[in-house]
Structure formats: structure tokens, C-alpha cells
């Protein structure tokens, strides 16, 4: 018999996460490594776990995530959005809870491009009056 799986895609900055929820005991695997081994920072682990804890689904599903691009913060945010969308697929009644906590909103902030004549996106070279 085929196992029930739920999918969700999350993006944040330049990171893209493809998340699969499989019935299990609450393991979170990111790119074939356990969550704490992959990120190493407690704050990022908490960020990833938030949707599961708010909806009381922490022990019901194993999370299998493939994430690429971006840095650690962007990847954690992308996984969080992917988990939230997959949970919504699993149980539509969770929408108000997830929406209230802001887990279904894609963060639109991106790195601003560098402009010519400037050192960074907005940092100008030192101005000399004379």
C-alpha cells in the first residue's frame, strides 16, 4: 500500500526548499542530514520547527526537505514556508492558525542589486566638498 505524503515548496531570499511530510515520529531531515547537524544554530532549528509546534503536529510527521541556494537563514525560512504549505495540504483546517502566525506568507524581501558608481547597493564613496 502506498504511503500518504504531503508536499510543499518554500522560497526565501535565494533559497528554494522542497518539503515532504511523511507520517512518522517527528524526525526532520534536511539534505539527508538531521536538522541540528545541518544548521547547527538553535535559533534556525526553532524557526524550522515553528509551524509543527503551533499546529501540534510535531510528533505526527517526519519532514524530509531538499533545499538549495541562499544562506542558512534563507534556507531555514524556505523550509518553514514549505512545511506550513505541506501541513495545509495535510489538513485544511489548520489555515487560520498558520495564517495568524504568518507562516503562509512568502517574505518578499530580496537582496538589493548593486548600482554602478556605488560601493554596495546604497553605500556611496566618501564625499569630499573640496
Swiss-Prot record:
**From start to end residue, where is composition biased (Basic residues)?**
111-130
Source gene?
Answer: rpsI
Among InterPro entries, the record links this protein to:
Ribosomal_Su5_D2-typ_SF, Ribosomal_uS9, Ribosomal_uS9_bac/plastid, Ribosomal_uS9_CS, Ribsml_uS5_D2-typ_fold_subgr
* Record's protein name: Small ribosomal subunit protein uS9
Write out the GO MF terms: RNA binding; structural constituent of ribosome
Please name the PROSITE patterns in this protein's record: RIBOSOMAL_S9 (PS00360)
The lineage is: Bacteria, Bacillati, Bacillota, Clostridia, Moorellales
Give the protein family: Belongs to the universal ribosomal protein uS9 family.
GO-annotated cellular components:
cytosolic small ribosomal subunit
Give TM segment ranges.
Answer: none
SUPFAM superfamilies the UniProt entry points to: Ribosomal protein S5 domain 2-like (SSF54211)
List UniProt keywords, sorted A-Z: Ribonucleoprotein, Ribosomal protein
Q: Where would one find the signal peptide in this protein?
A: none
> Could you tell me which residues belong to the region Disordered?
104-130
Answer whether the UniProt record assigns the keyword 4Fe-4S to this protein: no
Amino acid at each position: 500500500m502506498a504511503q500518504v505524503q504531503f508536499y510543499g515548496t518554500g522560497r526565501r531570499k535565494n533559497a528554494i526548499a522542497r518539503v515532504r511530510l511523511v507520517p512518522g515520529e517527528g524526525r526532520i531531515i534536511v539534505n539527508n542530514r538531521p536538522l541540528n547537524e545541518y544548521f547547527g544554530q538553535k535559533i534556525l532549528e526553532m524557526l524550522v520547527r515553528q509551524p509543527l509546534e503551533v499546529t501540534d503536529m510535531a510528533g505526527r510527521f517526519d519532514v524530509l526537505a531538499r533545499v538549495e541556494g541562499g544562506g542558512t537563514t534563507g534556507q531555514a525560512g524556505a523550509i518553514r514556508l514549505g512545511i506550513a504549505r505541506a501541513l495545509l495540504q495535510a489538513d485544511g483546517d489548520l489555515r487560520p492558525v498558520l495564517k495568524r502566525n504568518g507562516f503562509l506568507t512568502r517574505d518578499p524581501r530580496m537582496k538589493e542589486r548593486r548600482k554602478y558608481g556605488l560601493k554596495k547597493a546604497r553605500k556611496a564613496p566618501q564625499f569630499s566638498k573640496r
